[in-house]
């Protein structure tokens, strides 16, 4: 039997007892995202009704009918919350601490910037950048300063997970090419994510930008068995890739473009082969893989690690494998 569920309560701080204390921070304003006009074509999440239609008959069970589950955009946002439960369960069993889950603005309208209320009892902060760019969420100077101070504490890890940026051009023909490349009817011709995380990266001096929404290559003869990553394991002193061969299949993953030269201080640990049979400006430029996992080791006053990887790899909406669970285990048990 699963534990009883709670909602809309104040966070109870977790004592430091050796295990890593993990927190998830959803960067969205839940009310703003949930109340986007479904008549708008671009830059919104799908409604649950649209999800049910596209994924039929996956959600044609009583738990997802109108008497049990929200049918608008809010229902889709709740799918994201549900999709991290497997990760939370594993993290809790490994660390001995429950995963704390925060939202920038939650369902009840409470706003929570990243400050000491979150950071004081957090060792690994996972920033899931699923706010739309046009929502104009920005990291305040006080948040950047608080995170900088927190990263001076030994054993901290900031995981940044900016999501895809599909259709950022005004060229409608290119938008259509991108759409046909990823092939997901639930992603519109323009869907730009992660304004908050971008502003946070700028403030922290992280030389990375999330761009595109790329369909990963799959194992020949399959439709959604993702191809193995190209891991640079000799650079992976954290051991994030131990017993990890693949990430999660998701038809529109971001490329983490470096805006500074790769170096010991800016390490690309894994690149994902991209699907070459579907044209895309990224592959037409000669690229065959995209950056999927980046590590910025401690440097100067920063004693903590910074890791970049897409939030999709911590959800079960698009499946999950033993390799993925190994990644989770490695992250929550990394040196502290």
Give each language-model segment a name.
Residues 1-336:
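Short, surface-exposed patches at the edges or C-terminal ends of soluble domains, predominantly
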């Amino acid at each position: 039997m699963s534990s009883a569920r709670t909602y809309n309560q104040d966070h109870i701080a977790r004592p430091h007892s050796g295990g890593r204390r993990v927190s998830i921070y959803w960067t969205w304003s839940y009310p703003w995202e949930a109340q986007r006009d479904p008549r708008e074509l671009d830059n919104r999440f799908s409604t649950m009704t649209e999800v049910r239609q596209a994924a039929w008959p996956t959600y044609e069970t009583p738990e997802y009918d109108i008497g049990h589950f929200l049918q608008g955009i809010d229902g889709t946002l709740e799918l994201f919350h549900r999709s991290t439960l497997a990760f939370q369960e594993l993290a809790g069993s490994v660390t001995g601490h429950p995963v704390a889950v925060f939202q920038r603005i939650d369902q009840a309208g409470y706003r929570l910037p990243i400050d000491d209320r979150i950071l004081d009892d957090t060792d690994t902060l996972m920033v899931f950048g699923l706010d739309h760019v046009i929502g104009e969420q920005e990291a305040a100077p006080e948040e950047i300063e608080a995170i900088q101070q927190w990263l001076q504490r030994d054993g901290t890890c900031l995981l940044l997970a900016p999501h895809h940026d599909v259709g950022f051009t005004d060229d409608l023909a290119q938008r259509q090419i991108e759409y046909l490349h990823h092939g997901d009817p639930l992603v519109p011709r323009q869907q730009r994510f992660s304004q908050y995380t971008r502003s946070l990266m700028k403030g922290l001096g992280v030389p990375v930008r999330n761009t595109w929404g790329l369909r990963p290559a799959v194992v020949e003869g399959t439709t959604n068995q993702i191809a193995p990553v190209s891991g640079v394991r000799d650079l992976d002193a954290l051991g994030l890739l131990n017993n990890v061969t693949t990430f999660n299949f998701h038809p529109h993953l971001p490329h983490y473009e470096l805006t500074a030269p790769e170096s010991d201080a800016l390490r690309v640990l894994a690149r994902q082969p991209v699907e070459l049979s579907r044209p895309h400006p990224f592959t037409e430029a000669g690229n065959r893989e995209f950056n999927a996992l980046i590590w910025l080791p401690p440097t100067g006053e920063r004693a903590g690690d910074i890791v970049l990887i897409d939030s999709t790899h911590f959800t079960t909406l698009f499946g999950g494998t033993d390799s993925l669970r190994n990644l989770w285990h490695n992250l929550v048990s990394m040196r502290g």
